[in-house]
Amino acid sequence: MAMKIGTQKFKERVSDGLDNEFMRGAVSSAQERLRARRLEAAKELGNWEEWRSLAEEIRQHVLENLDYYLEQLAENVAKKGGHVFFAQTAEEATGYIRDVVKKKNGKKIVKSKSMVTEEINMNEALESDGCEVVETDLGEYILQIDDHDPPSHIVAPALHKNKEQIRDVFKERIGYRNTEKPEELVMHARAVLRKKFLEADIGITGCNFAIADTGSVSLVTNEGNGRLVTTIPKTQITVMGMERIVPSFDEFEVLVGMLTRSAVGQRLTSYITALTGPRLPGEADGPEEFHLVIVDNGRSNILGTEFQSVLQCIRCAACINVCPVYRHVGGHSYGSIYSGPIGAVLSPLLGGYDDYKELPYASSLCAACSEACPVKIPLHELLLKHRQRIVEKEGRAPISEKLAMKAFGLGTSAPSLYKMGSKWAPAAMKPFKEDGKITKGPGPLKQWTQIRDFPAPNKSRFRDWFEDRRKEKGEDK
């Protein structure tokens, strides 16, 4: 699965999302639940704004010194017996991974949850070589066996499915014969996946944070699949975005606490795993060979720009869990594996405006996302910067919008034209008026009035009213 999901146009995806009543209900319920948990976890920690500021400082410091910490990380991984590969593009990353798998004669691969591997289309690349790649995160596994259904949420990828749908998928694909009770579904998936773990040649993981001064990589999970992926297969490959790094375990401790509280409202998740290189002599478990693939794929182009702060993201999805737009249209409407406010900022930067020019406009600019972000990314401001760039630098504004803005600018710059326009506006809008409102507007108003009414121009103009008042009081002009 690549970063882009589906071939539908943005408006079609949004329409499908609005029509999906179950999805909207599930998203609304999940948002309320996760938001309440996050607020309670923040209250329990105390001094939440100070913790946010500290987390922001850590992420800013890393980005400003990223070359130093990446070099330190690579050196320490190599010292511990691991291999490091810097991939500038998605193709370079998948090419290296495919080469490692071929050299190890790997055919069966187990994988823990990783957004960056989906971004670079890794699964499809390995499957084209005849490998079996099995997602072991339960949500990702459900989506994979359901014809590679794309994720709709960064933390809860199968949020858009209910238990009855999951039951039917299990019955059709993995021989399930029981009810839709979650515990029965989980037990069946566990039995199927346990066999996959034991048969695997290669384990592939993502990385929540890499620790530069020890050469370690960390996994934050609630299911324990990450530990099985990293301890049973003989070869482990970890894939990380180049920005997902901290100087030491001191900074890691701060960020992982902010991550778990912001994502699911927990003090800590069930499993926090730090792995440092391949198995050493005398150790009971762990891989015999370890590879770390550090992916750029457009991230270096963001460094040093007005959008650099988006790379502070720790993938907690707190912004998604408070977004009113996501609440109504769901994750698939964004057309990217990165949904919600963070996706609306990041996807155009990594994937370009050709595919994602609408996303910066998929926002009410209420700033709830910026307030929720544990590392203080000013998401609503970045969305505005995107809009400005789209119009001024990219020249991608619709022709109708350009003409409307030019007409408005011309009219408001000349008092005589403004006076004439305000005088004739009520008559011009009369054919579209119904019960004092415009219900089916022309031109640029058409899309607006498809879903809401537009106030009709009033025959009584403010300037006339004001002038009459002045005359009544005998005031001079």
Swiss-Prot record:
Residue span of region Disordered: 433-477
NCBIfam families: LutB/LldF family L-lactate oxidation iron-sulfur protein
Residues binding [4Fe-4S] cluster 2, per UniProt: C323, C366, C369
Function: Is involved in L-lactate degradation and allows cells to grow with lactate as the sole carbon source. Has probably a role as an electron transporter during oxidation of L-lactate.
SUPFAM superfamilies listed in its UniProt record: alpha-helical ferredoxin (SSF46548), NagB/RpiA/CoA transferase-like (SSF100950)
GO biological process: lactate metabolic process
Similarity comment: family membership: Belongs to the LutB/YkgF family.
Domain 4Fe-4S ferredoxin-type: residue ranges: 304-334, 353-382
Gene that this polypeptide is encoded by: lutB
PANTHER family reported in the protein's UniProt record: LACTATE UTILIZATION PROTEIN B
Domain of life: Bacteria
Gene Ontology MF: a single term: 4 iron, 4 sulfur cluster binding
UniProt-annotated binding residues for [4Fe-4S] cluster 1: C313, C316, C319, C373
Protein name per UniProt: Lactate utilization protein B
HAMAP family recorded: LutB
Keyword annotations from UniProtKB, A to Z: 4Fe-4S, Electron transport, Iron, Iron-sulfur, Metal-binding, Repeat, Transport
